[in-house]
């Protein structure tokens, strides 16, 4: 029998948000969503720094509490910076999130993702189609978007099994595949998260923001699984509230409402009652 996600991670849900400290999150990311990610971190009272020059790594790593590596915009220089940061994080025990943006689209990103995995990051995430490609399963994703064809019950179970195999080689890494149902897999278990609304797929940067939120929670000392489950659930609940308040507005208003809720929802005592998900 499955167990409710809020029962499994009860303490984390009760204490993680609002933040009681302001973790500094170093983000090596893309130009498309960098402003959204920085503001999302500020909205939850974390602190962002978008520093991707290797020459500054020793000083920034000495100050930061977590690292986010996002593959959203690749160049030769950025690839080298991502690889260098991954190694630096492993050497300094910096909590790290790898966001596999576009890994289902090109061989270069697939190879880079696996190079970064060798450093045993805390979290590796992507949409369902990206994570299927990363796990060497057939993926029907196009560009950086996930495909509905990859989100059937059978496909989700297949991906869960493949990611569980990956945890045998990387037991300290938690894997997240986002979609209509979000899949979280680690050496400790498998969880389905079931919040969210379709509109979240219709403005750019939602996955990037989730990666930043996970990194912030890791920076407070939360363990990998709890950081992933709380961050994903919180962001999806923000989207649900925004959708309920924006029944006649367009997507731009929905986007603004979702981002507004990042700074508001955690102060609502009953937001935990919104959370839906289960342990398998």
From Swiss-Prot:
GO terms for molecular function: ATP binding; hydroxyethylthiazole kinase activity; magnesium ion binding. Pathway: Cofactor biosynthesis; thiamine diphosphate biosynthesis; 4-methyl-5-(2-phosphoethyl)-thiazole from 5-(2-hydroxyethyl)-4-methylthiazole: step 1/1. It is an enzyme of class 2 (transferase). InterPro entries: Hyethyz_kinase, Ribokinase-like. Substrate binds at residues 50, 205. ATP binds at residues 125, 178. GO terms for biological process: thiamine biosynthetic process; thiamine diphosphate biosynthetic process. It comes from the Bacteria. It catalyses: 5-(2-hydroxyethyl)-4-methylthiazole + ATP = 4-methyl-5-(2-phosphooxyethyl)-thiazole + ADP + H(+). Its EC number is 2.7.1.50. SUPFAM superfamilies: Ribokinase-like. Keywords: ATP-binding, Kinase, Magnesium, Metal-binding, Nucleotide-binding, Thiamine biosynthesis, Transferase. Its cofactor is Mg(2+). Catalyzes the phosphorylation of the hydroxyl group of 4-methyl-5-beta-hydroxyethylthiazole (THZ). Belongs to the Thz kinase family. This is Hydroxyethylthiazole kinase. The lineage of its organism: Bacteria, Bacillati, Bacillota, Bacilli, Lactobacillales.
